Amino acid sequence: MPESPALVVFYGGTGDSPVERTVDDARLSAALDAAEAAREGGIDRAIFVTDQSDLAVDLAGVAVDISAEPFHFGRRLADVVRRRQLDAVIYAGAGSVPLFAADDFREVASRLARGVIVTNNSFSSDLVAFPANEPALAAVERVERDNALARALSEAGLPVDELARTVTTQMDIDSPSDLLVLGLTGEGGPRLREHLAGLPPDTALYARTLPLFTDRASQIVVAGRVGSHSWAYLERETACRVRLFAEERGMEADGRAEAGAARSLLGFFLESVGLDRFFETLSELGDAAFIDTRVLLGHKRIAASRQDRFLSDLGEPDAISEPFLRDFTRSALAAPLPVLLGGHSLMSGGLMALNEHAWALSEQGA
């Protein structure tokens, strides 16, 4: 049985634009909080793997592993594990599970010690704990993206145990929409909360959606990579009706977007009726809409830059260089209902966090 797992955090692929730096700094803040929480949970060794030559981490038990070599996720992870002679690993991308506390890491380590691989999402993983044996590492080496890691280990015949789908296990920091959710709800570790407190983004649009979650007469539209667990959560935990368009789950892990194979019913409808009618129709279907723009971009085979995607999430169309995304974002802002734009995390942990915050405010009479 594996013992003494090490927390291995990957922090790289950072951008140069202000909006990218804002998200990347938040990811690093969350990763530092995670390392501290893991240590409190009995995991006394952490390794930050990065391509940032100037990254310095002043936390007890944390080492920094820097490489400027061409990046391949699986080979890099397996190399770190072998070179540092790790017995077991809790892998997390920087910004993953920003709500994890000491007890959460303790639970992961306990399950791992029983001989099973542990993940927050078998289909698209952000956190994976695994024994550092050769069968596992052979599977790890073949993985190109971290969100395919749990599935690759399962397909190699190794037992995988999935954590319960909760806000804590599903919240992730991938884009500015996640920062807006966390800024509104006030959740996260101390470094992340301090970082969010210094940001200018306006959460008013997100706040407008909160009363809908607790109102039986309201309806929200959710469109994008929504898994069955998220759908079940929304049906079970919200008072409002939910109109769901679930499309292209696993699009990134399977490489369908990159290959130009993603297809979206909403995308076909948008192409048929145009932007104005598209958003008019949304207002006839619900009182607010949550849209995973990455699915629409994949459908249209548009490789929008990370900067442009983030600017769209923030509702800043004038700075977006990609024409479709600029026009779509501008139309979303002018729509007759609140339209929240984001990526996969908004469709899962983000919606969960907003709903739970809405109920907390409702119970307080706010």
PLM-predicted stretches and their roles:
Residues 141-203, 318-323:
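Catalytic core and acceptor-binding pocket of nucleotide-sugar-dependent glycosyltransferases
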Residues 187-233, 326:
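Charge-dense polyanion-binding interfaces
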Residues 1-17:
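N-terminal nucleotide-binding beta1-loop-alpha1 segment
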Residues 218-366:
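Extended non-globular C-terminal regions
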Residues 58-89, 98, 325:
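Short phosphate-binding loop-to-helix
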Residues 44-65:
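Acidic donor-binding segment of Leloir-type glycosyltransferases
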Residues 97-124:
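Conserved donor-nucleotide/metal-binding helix-loop-beta segment in metal-dependent transferases, i.e.
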Residues 27-43:
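A short, N-terminal amphipathic alpha-helix
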